[in-house]
């Protein structure tokens, strides 16, 4: 398979892709250039593309430091895949049910879903930084962007319900709090200490020593790490891991609540169900996955490609060289902005023919199949880490604009 090697000052990353955009290369290079991440095993998945503050498709082993921004704001985002016993579904009725019962975009539920009982968000270390009421009413809400509800059909006619969503605004609140705390811990005290020292030296008339002292203090506090890579360690590390796991559970319950609304509202019967998560830290193996999924030996996982081509159901191979990971999708070919500028609604409508959807609208053009890498590119690369069990194709799709 194709691979790009990126050598930095303190680490070397392997990217399992034939081509790598410059922005993603620069982000990965920046991580490899920090001595704090020396010794971390960095493996980047085939669906790699530049993201906000970090590269989508990143996997890396971690020890005593974590960059909250590398996990990102949608902590625990992923897919719930449910095999159904039914072979036919009334899609018009399903679409009406979703629009009536599942909030999407920025909306949340009026009433709290029963699954809230399985989670106590007041246990968050950063609970006072979070809108708990909004969070509780968000369990059972889809959100926007690339989140979707889909029904897919296997070759033999079996139907699958797939729900892709995450931790909604709660994840953003938790991520931003810890990223800010990391910055404050790394630099806030240093800047304050430098200013206080200068004031004191001025008061004592030691003007000639000021510059030398500032240089020494800056070296001591190492203010060289990029803002996006501010990390947490010590007690903050422990608090972040604790809150990330709670937020991850919240994201799982959010998807399960939507599945519950659909199954009960439509009278559908589940046969099998599995979860695939792609923004989190696997605390058992201490592996960070950002836009990548776990692919341990025999583990069932879903790789969604796009609205037209559906998803691959795979089995992990437990390849240590890949950090036991696989791509979380096809990966974007163009940015959202570029997609809105370059793509046409005519082409979008043509590509989605034969799939029941009320969501092929100008606002979702950035999510059209043309905005993503091809299925062939991903299939060509994943052999060492995952075995494709079957491909499932969309027959119904619901996706909200932001």
Regions found by a protein language model. Name each.
Residues 68-124:
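A generic, well-ordered mixed alpha/beta core segment in the N-terminal half of proteins
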Residues 2-30, 37-44, 50-56, 65-68, ...:
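Domain-length cofactor-binding catalytic modules of enzymes
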Residues 46-47, 74:
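Acidic active-site catalytic centers that drive phospho-/nucleotidyl reactions
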Residues 59-60:
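Glycine-rich phosphate/pyrophosphate-binding loop regions near the starts of catalytic domains
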């Amino acid at each position: 398979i194709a691979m790009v090697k990126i050598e930095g000052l303190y680490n070397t990353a392997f990217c399992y892709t034939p081509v790598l955009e410059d922005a993603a290369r620069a982000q990965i290079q920046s991580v490899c250039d920090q001595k704090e991440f020396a010794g971390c095993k960095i493996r980047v998945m085939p669906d790699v593309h530049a993201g906000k503050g970090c590269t989508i498709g990143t996997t890396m082993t971690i020890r005593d430091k974590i960059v909250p921004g590398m996990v990102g704001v949608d902590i625990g985002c992923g897919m719930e895949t449910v095999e159904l016993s039914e072979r036919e579904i009334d899609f018009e009725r399903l679409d009406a049910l979703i629009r009536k019962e599942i909030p999407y975009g920025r909306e949340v539920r009026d009433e709290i879903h029963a699954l809230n009982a399985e989670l106590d968000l007041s246990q968050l270390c950063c609970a006072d930084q979070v809108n708990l009421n909004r969070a509780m009413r968000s369990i059972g809400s889809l959100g926007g962007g690339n989140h979707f509800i889909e029904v897919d059909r296997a070759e033999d006619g079996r139907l699958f319900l797939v729900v892709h969503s995450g931790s909604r605004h709660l994840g953003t609140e938790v991520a931003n709090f810890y990223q800010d705390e990391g910055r404050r811990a790394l630099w806030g005290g240093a800047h304050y200490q430098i200013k206080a020292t200068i004031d004191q030296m001025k008061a004592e008339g030691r003007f000639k020593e000021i510059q030398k002292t500032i240089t020494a203090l800056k070296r001591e506090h190492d203010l060289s790490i990029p803002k996006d890579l501010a990390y947490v360690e010590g007690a903050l590390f422990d608090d972040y891991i604790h809150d990330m796991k709670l937020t991850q559970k919240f994201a799982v319950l959010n998807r399960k609540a939507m599945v519950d609304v659909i199954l009960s509202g439509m009278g559908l019967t589940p046969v099998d169900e599995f979860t695939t998560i792609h923004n989190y830290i696997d605390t058992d193996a201490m592996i960070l996955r950002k836009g990548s999924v776990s692919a341990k030996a025999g583990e069932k996982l879903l790789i969604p490609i796009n609205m037209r081509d559906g998803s691959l159901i795979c089995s992990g191979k437990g390849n240590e060289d890949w950090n036991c990971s696989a791509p979380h999708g096809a990966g974007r070919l163009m940015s959202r902005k570029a997609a809105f500028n370059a793509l046409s609604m005519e082409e979008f409508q043509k590509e989605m023919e034969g799939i029941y959807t009320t969501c092929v609208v100008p606002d979702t053009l950035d999510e059209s199949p043309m905005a993503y890498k091809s299925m062939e590119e991903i299939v060509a690369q994943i052999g060492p880490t995952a075995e494709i069990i079957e491909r499932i194709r969309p027959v119904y799709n619901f996706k909200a604009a932001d």
